[in-house]
Amino acid sequence: MSNEFNAQSFLRTVSSSAGVYRMYDVKNDVIYVGKAKDLKKRLTSYFRKNLANVKTQALVSHIHHIDVTLTHSETDALLLENDYIKQYMPKYNVLLRDDKSYPYILLSQHEHPRLAYHRGPQREKGHYFGPYPNGGAVRESLHLMQKLFPIRQCDDLYYKSRSRPCLQYQISRCSAPCVGKVSNADYDEQVKLASLFLKGKDQQVISALVDKMELAAERQAYEQAARFRDQIMALRKVAEQQEVSNNKGDMDVIGVHYSSGIACFHLLFIREGKIFGSRSYYPSVPAQTDMDEVLRSFILQFYLNADIQRTIPKEVVISHNFEELHELEAAISEALDKKFSIKTNVRADRASFLRLAVTNATNAVVTRLSHKNTVEQRFVLLEEILELSTPIQRMECFDISHTMGESTVASCVVFNREGPHKGEYRRYNIEGITPGDDYAAMKQAVSRRFDKIEAGGKIPDILFIDGGLGQLRIAQKIVDEKFVHLDKAPQLIGVAKGEGRKPGLETLILGDTETSFSLEGDSPALHLIQHIRDESHRFAITGHRNRRQKTRNTSTLESIPGIGPKRRKALLQHLGGLQEVKGASVAELVKVPGISIEMAQTIHDALRG
């Protein structure tokens, strides 16, 4: 325990009321947030002579001072604790980093409703189906919906501009309501069936289609009956592949596995009795944290994160019981202003779903541990090769990407001892250099990365430069300048491509001595270097391609007199892209808002050359 903190003196001032406490280190950073029904009793437990928990010992050794906030009840304390954890992100708390909003399928309110991918605030009027675990699940579902129901998925601007059916109509993925190829009644019927399907009422949809097929057959409308038959067969095939519960309610099913410091919470999103998707979460867990705290922290942070646009069900099923479960139920119910229950002992369909979730969580942890051990071994070997006295905690790698000097982008990727740390990746749009000057691009990127570096900042132990001696020298010079007043600086290593750019033939160059050496092609340490180099290249080229496409779209249209950012955006949105604008007739261009007949002719002439 720090000599600067007098625990006995502090504890004499602490109330026995409910409340929240914040522990600070010598740098005045919050290192732990906790809550208690009895603050005096809880805080006293930290300063016993024999602390069994290693994590608690480490925490107490760093305490400089403690602040407490009294609350009216334990429920209030839980809510305030969650707010403080989100605000301070303390290093000794279990932290759930889940800042992405969840995607939905939107069925819009329109004369001819559309199905669309939606993420973010639900401002547009319509029905939202979800949440889905990720964007890929939504896109897969929309692709399936196109096969089952001929409902438009184009945006309203594109819909308004059509004078003839698009390709989706030709391949039977849309009924072309934009040009009157389907009656409003028939289109509305398909929208109704699609809505029922998204709610999980597959059998109701199939029954309705069977009735329609039989009615069409009685009227001898055999072509229409055949279309209904094909739709029924497609729906039955989909229904057979989906796991559905007899319980038609909404719930989240959470399987948990915690081993060797890695916790996985695998969630099944059950909506209307159907699995909408699943997603694994890996909260950051300080060493030696007990299972109860991991469970409590996850549930509290996941269901009280108001920044995320997520539909929260009334029921959550979880694989493990834990202390304070009922207190959490009450706190979350109060915060959400609706009934919220957490169940652990379940049977029938719920038990089946729970077994599935636990199996996935267990497999995920086993896989991650295997990967972690492999990466750890590679780090250890690299440390031995470089004869380092301290373990490598952070590595970064820079790469430059451009096409003949156009739209140059630099990437900086970050690896820690668990592999890629994608939240720390950065891209730099390179400006003001001679096109194709890789040395100048590297100089600008490294300068921007370390422009305001401080002793307490994120300093890599190893900094790889994807390039030869010239680029390495540029980077080394910048690092020497930026770190001249600091005790620590990164070790720079150039990764020069081998003969024929073949993997395994790379030459490594130390930045400080310019000594060159190579590793065996099957060396795990080389595989680690190749991994971070390849990841840096991938991240750079993706950024370059995006920037290049944006630049080309912008420059092609904005070079036309009278076309500014607003008109360019209107043209691209209305017609669907640059190629569509280039292929549009004057009559089609005039339909774009803000484009006159004279302007349309100018655009047409400029793009047709």
Curated annotation (Swiss-Prot):
Keyword list, A-Z: Cytoplasm, DNA damage, DNA excision, DNA repair, Excision nuclease, SOS response
UniProt cross-references to InterPro entries, sorted A to Z: GIY-YIG_endonuc (IPR000305), GIY-YIG_endonuc_sf (IPR035901), GIY-YIG_UvrC_Cho (IPR047296), Hlx-hairpin-Hlx_DNA-bd_motif (IPR003583), RuvA_2-like (IPR010994), UVR_dom (IPR001943), UVR_dom_sf (IPR036876), UvrABC_protein_C (IPR050066)
Domain of life where this protein originates: Bacteria
UVR domain location: 203-238
Alphabetical list of CDD domains matching this protein: GIY-YIG_UvrC_Cho
Family assignment from sequence similarity: Belongs to the UvrC family.
Function in brief: The UvrABC repair system catalyzes the recognition and processing of DNA lesions. UvrC both incises the 5' and 3' sides of the lesion. The N-terminal half is responsible for the 3' incision and the C-terminal half is responsible for the 5' incision.
Subunit structure: Interacts with UvrB in an incision complex.
Name of protein: UvrABC system protein C
